[in-house]
Amino acid sequence: LWLWPYLFFIEAVPIRKVQDDTKTLIKTIVTRINDISHTQSVSSKQRVTGLDFIPGLHPVLSLSKMDQTLAIYQQILTSLPSRNVIQISNDLENLRDLLHLLASSKSCPLPQARGLETLASLGGVLEASLLLHRGGSPEQAAGVS
């Protein structure tokens, strides 16, 4: 109860700041993934060149689908033996928090997706990602005819 007076003085974070922080964090994650792939002799076919579910690149995907995809990737990262991926996993958690903040700002709060529950849909996410990399349309990747 003693916190209530302080809560009235807290200003809302401008949505533009949240969007900018989201973009910066995405760039940081991609850079960290690329750094790992350079230091651990990963094949160029396996290298990450970007994240297809970034808002703005493929507006067909919903915020909840993006959150689900991030939860899947986070689950995969936490199961890898490398210590280098711990920070990336933490970054993904922060990115998911920003995504939830963006959704709340649009009055559509997201349910918390859980990695283990969403891991079953990994095949669909990977297929959509591969289709987009091969030049398919976002509609095809989303399964819309």
UniProtKB/Swiss-Prot annotation:
GO CC entries: extracellular space
Domain of life: Eukaryota
Segments forming a coiled coil: none
Molecular functions per Gene Ontology: hormone activity; peptide hormone receptor binding
Keyword entries, A-Z: Obesity, Secreted, Signal
InterPro entries per the UniProt record, alphabetical: 4_helix_cytokine-like_core, Leptin
GO biological process: activation of protein kinase C activity; bone growth; cellular response to leptin stimulus; energy reserve metabolic process; intestinal absorption; leptin-mediated signaling pathway; lipid metabolic process; negative regulation of appetite by leptin-mediated signaling pathway
Cell location: Secreted
Keyword Signal: yes
Known role: Key player in the regulation of energy balance and body weight control. Once released into the circulation, has central and peripheral effects by binding LEPR, found in many tissues, which results in the activation of several major signaling pathways. In the hypothalamus, acts as an appetite-regulating factor that induces a decrease in food intake and an increase in energy consumption by inducing anorexinogenic factors and suppressing orexigenic neuropeptides, also regulates bone mass and secretion of hypothalamo-pituitary-adrenal hormones.
Family: Belongs to the leptin family.
Protein name: Leptin
